[in-house]
């Protein structure tokens, strides 16, 4: 781990994959639990701020920039104190993690699945939410590298992507939004996806209940962001 104090209010920390491994953390571990992210970032702050110049009641911002080699973390303080009333109004107690919006949705565990109720194909070839089940593909991937390759190849349109780990294997679930894509277009995208894995008999409901969701709603976009 490398640390650079940019100024009195900002510290830059470079964490390699080995540093993350020593702490029992991977980038994927940070995707699903906002409290885990906050706890991890504060543990890093405790390590690098040996002089305790960042007071515990000051507002702190964590800006994370992941890469294939690890991640870079900018820790900044505003110099303003967090009073009790402000703390009561926020779960994060003055903490902010700055990442692109769709990555923020992954980190905070936001779920857009309520947009995916019941889908079908209408006379124009488009998915109709009122008439039939969802158009969905559950893909079993040989390894994580195949997922990265798939993310680099497929620009998903009219749907969402969720990545799960179940029984030491990775599964990608592609679900297509109602009224946004024709059945032919959906099947074309599924054909591309199946070049990187095998169609699985498991359902997304089984994976959701018994597996571990690693990336939610925008798994392909998230992978392209983190693993450039």
UniProtKB/Swiss-Prot annotation:
Extent of Acidic residues compositional bias: 85-95
Domain notes: The N-terminal domain probably binds unfolded/aggregated proteins; the C-terminal domain interacts with ClpC.
Subunit structure and binding partners: Homodimer.
Listed name of the protein: Adapter protein MecA
Highest taxon, organism lineage: Bacteria
Gene3D superfamilies: 3.30.70.1950
UniProt cross-references to Pfam families, sorted A to Z: MecA
Residues making up the signal peptide according to the UniProt record: none
Function according to Swiss-Prot or TrEMBL: Enables the recognition and targeting of unfolded and aggregated proteins to the ClpC protease or to other proteins involved in proteolysis.
Region (Disordered): 79-98
A GO molecular function held by the record: protein-macromolecule adaptor activity
């Amino acid at each position: 781990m490398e640390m650079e104090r940019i100024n009195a209010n900002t510290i830059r920390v470079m964490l390699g994959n080995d540093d993350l491994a020593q702490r029992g953390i991977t980038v994927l571990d940070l995707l699903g639990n906002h409290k885990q992210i906050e706890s991890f970032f504060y543990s890093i702050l405790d390590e690098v701020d040996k002089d305790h110049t960042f007071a515990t009641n000051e507002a702190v911002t964590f800006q994370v920039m992941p890469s294939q080699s690890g991640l870079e973390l900018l820790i900044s303080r505003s110099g303003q104190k967090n009073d009790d009333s402000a703390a009561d109004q926020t779960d994060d107690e003055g903490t902010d993690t700055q990442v692109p919006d769709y990555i923020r949705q992954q980190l905070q565990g936001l779920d857009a699945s309520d947009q995916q109720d019941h889908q079908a194909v209408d006379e124009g070839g488009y998915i109709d939410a009122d008439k039939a089940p969802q158009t969905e593909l559950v893909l079993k991937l040989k390894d994580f590298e195949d997922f990265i390759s798939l993310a680099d190849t497929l620009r998903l349109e009219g749907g969402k992507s969720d990545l799960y780990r179940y029984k030491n294997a990775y599964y990608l679930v592609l679900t297509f939004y109602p009224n946004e894509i024709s059945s032919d277009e959906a099947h074309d995208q599924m054909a591309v996806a199946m070049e990187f894995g095998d169609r699985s008999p498991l359902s997304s409901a089984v994976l959701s209940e018994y597996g571990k969701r690693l990336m939610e709603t925008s798994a392909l976009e998230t992978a392209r962001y983190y693993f450039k």
